[in-house]
Amino acid sequence: MEEEMSNRRVSNRTRKVATKMAAALTSNDNRTQAAIARLEALENDNGAIEVIDLNDDEEASLDEDDDLGYLQKKQHKGSKRKTRQAKALEARKAPKSFLELLQEANLESLPSHVPTYLKAAVGPPSSSSRRYFCSVCGYIAGYNCCLCGMRFCSIRCQNIHKDTRCQKFVA
């Protein structure tokens, strides 16, 4: 890997960015909007969790001591049996987002002494400086992108960031 990087030719030509583009990239509003958009995309990706029905396997739920278990599993006349299609539709139901779960929890109805997600206390601010992490690998980052402001830790992560993650065209 090191040999590939040393054999690579490096350009001395500087990049010219349009003044409007540079102004848009340096504004904190655009950077916060891009960060919020990335967080929403992550939340949407995490929302597609597959639900597994534990009561799906009837044979696994039978007692091993009961030899006549398969005879006692007859359907009652009043109950409806779920079809495969109904089970598949139930499994495909869209999972709820975090905000929807918070609204359903009805946290306002709880007594005031009960700690909730919204009432959780934050400790005093740290006396040490803030730590920044690499947007590619998660290690401690010492550098940041001059175009979009995201952080990276090494040349390898910088190259990956430039190829795939740089938000220079968001504005």
UniProtKB/Swiss-Prot annotation:
Name listed for the protein in its UniProt record: SWR1 complex subunit 6
Family as reported in the entry's similarity comment: Belongs to the ZNHIT1 family.
One Pfam family per UniProt: zf-HIT
Listed GO biological process terms: cell differentiation; chromatin remodeling; defense response to bacterium; flower development; regulation of developmental growth; regulation of flower development
The protein's role, per its UniProt record: Component of the SWR1 complex which mediates the ATP-dependent exchange of histone H2A for the H2A variant H2A.F/Z leading to transcriptional regulation of selected genes (e.g. FLC) by chromatin remodeling. Coodinates SWR1-C, FRI-C (FLC transcription activator complex), histone methyltransferase and general transcription factors. Represses flowering by positively regulating FLC and MAF4. Binds to the promoter region of FLC chromatin.
Cellular location(s): Nucleus speckle; Nucleus
Lineage of source species: Eukaryota, Viridiplantae, Streptophyta, Embryophyta, Tracheophyta
Annotated Zn(2+) 1 binding sites: C134, C137, C153, C157
Annotated binding of Zn(2+) 2, by residue: C145, C148, H161, C166
UniProt xrefs under PROSITE patterns: ZF_HIT
Knockout consequences: Early flowering, leaf serration, production of extra petals and weak apical dominance.
Disordered as annotated region, ranges: 63-87
Zinc fingers, HIT-type class: 134-166
Biased composition (Basic residues): 73-85
InterPro entries: Vps71/ZNHIT1, Znf_HIT
Top-level taxon of origin: Eukaryota
The protein's assembly and partners: Homodimer. Component of the SWR1 chromatin-remodeling complex composed of at least ARP6/ESD1/SUF3, PIE1, SWC6, SWC2 and H2AZs (HTA8, HTA9, HTA11). Interacts directly with ARP6, PIE1 and SWC2. Interacts with FLX and SUF4, two component of the transcription activator complex FRI-C, and with ASHH2 and TAF14.
Origin species: Arabidopsis thaliana (Mouse-ear cress)
Keyword Zinc-finger: yes
Record keywords: Developmental protein, Differentiation, Flowering, Metal-binding, Nucleus, Zinc, Zinc-finger
Main localization category: nucleus
